[in-house]
């Protein structure tokens, strides 16, 4: 197995990712007041060649002190977006990345 820190690059923090965490925390800060899901979900940036089982093993190895168990992993490849650089004179692209939405069993969380 690869080094777990080569597979999991970092925690992904956006409004949608935080909304997923709040839904699993049961704080009711989702789209509908009082909405929640049973299992905690977190979003991570992962390596492009990472597979779902490899992501699950890496997270369980990184958070071995919290004794987490991964229930499921969903992955999304985000395509590079067009961008302009140097005051709009040159065209380029942002770098694409792969993100993983990881669902943990109820009672197990990394947060």
Curated annotation (Swiss-Prot):
Summarizing the function annotation, the protein's role is: One of the early assembly proteins it binds 23S rRNA. One of the proteins that surrounds the polypeptide exit tunnel on the outside of the ribosome. Forms the main docking site for trigger factor binding to the ribosome.
**InterPro entries found in the cross-reference section:** Nucleotide-bd_a/b_plait_sf, Ribosomal_uL23-like, Ribosomal_uL23/eL15/eS24_sf
List, in alphabetical order, the Gene Ontology terms for molecular function in this entry: rRNA binding; structural constituent of ribosome
Q: Which organism is it from?
A: Chlamydia pneumoniae
How would you summarize the oligomeric state and partners of this protein? Part of the 50S ribosomal subunit. Contacts protein L29, and trigger factor when it is bound to the ribosome.
From the record, what ranges are coiled-coil?
Answer: none
Query: GO CC annotations?
Result: ribonucleoprotein complex; ribosome
- The yes or no answer to whether the keyword Mitochondrion is present is no
Write out the similarity annotation: Belongs to the universal ribosomal protein uL23 family.
Q: Which gene name does the record give?
A: rplW
Return the SUPFAM superfamilies for the record. Ribosomal proteins S24e, L23 and L15e
- Name it: Large ribosomal subunit protein uL23
Signal peptide span: none
A Pfam family that the UniProt record links to this protein = Ribosomal_L23
Q: Could you name the domain of life of the organism this protein comes from? A: Bacteria
Task: For this UniProt record, give its keywords in alphabetical order, as a comma-separated list.
Answer: Ribonucleoprotein, Ribosomal protein, RNA-binding, rRNA-binding
- Stored HAMAP family: Ribosomal_uL23_B
Q: Which GO terms describe its biological process?
A: translation
